[in-house]
Amino acid sequence: MNITPFPTLSPATIDAINVIGQWLAQDDFSGEVPYQADCVILAGNAVMPTIDAACKIARDQQIPLLISGGIGHSTTFLYSAIAQHPHYNTIRTTGRAEATILADIAHQFWHIPHEKIWIEDQSTNCGENARFSIALLNQAVERVHTAIVVQDPTMQRRTMATFRRMTGDNPDAPRWLSYPGFVPQLGNNADSVIFINQLQGLWPVERYLSLLTGELPRLRDDSDGYGPRGRDFIVHVDFPAEVIHAWQTLKHDAVLIEAMESRSLR
């Protein structure tokens, strides 16, 4: 896939992007995941390091891996990511739900037994990921007390707010722990913006920026956001001052705005 490099941005804008990116990639752990959980929930996405992180936890802790994802508006990004992967490109994708594709990765490449893979293949958005996953957990023979939720880092904070909205004050609900697998960071090279993380299977830079800039309006708790005072999809989310400041930096960067508009990303 030939993608036009994203033009270099000011150091202040790069810093602002990384502040927001780190905040969105909510990580309840420091470094590796040491906490023994009862289940890992992998929400369908197309970020290979995140997918691998969920599989690694399930394999190492020998716990069930619940994979959630049907066929939605972003499924083709997973198809493309699989096709470009040096190992996973042998997996059939076209016309298949995200969960079934990721289950093949978990079993064939991470050697997770079929009985430890729980598939939810009907959800098409973040809300359904949470609702249908919780319904599947409720059918488990043994109660799940703690679940590690793994999602595309740009959607991690919203996904956690969605799970907490779905379970509310239910005392029997699992303890939801957030883990994005890694935290993306951008930087400038000589003539373009690149990921400092040298990892296989990341988004194109322009796709990452589109997702990142689209998340903050959704997380707001106002008439246009997803919070209780808006569409009521998520619990209230507090925005740190540095994130608000970073968002203002992005909104007033003419180079960023022009580059994204030229790519139809706004």
UniProtKB/Swiss-Prot annotation:
It holds the Pfam family DUF218. PANTHER family: DUF218 DOMAIN-CONTAINING PROTEIN (PTHR30336:SF20), INNER MEMBRANE PROTEIN, PROBABLE PERMEASE (PTHR30336). Monomer. This is Protein YdcF. InterPro entries: Cell_Envelope_Assoc, DUF218, Rossmann-like_a/b/a_fold. Binds S-adenosyl-L-methionine (AdoMet). GO terms for cellular component: plasma membrane. To S.coelicolor SCO4629.
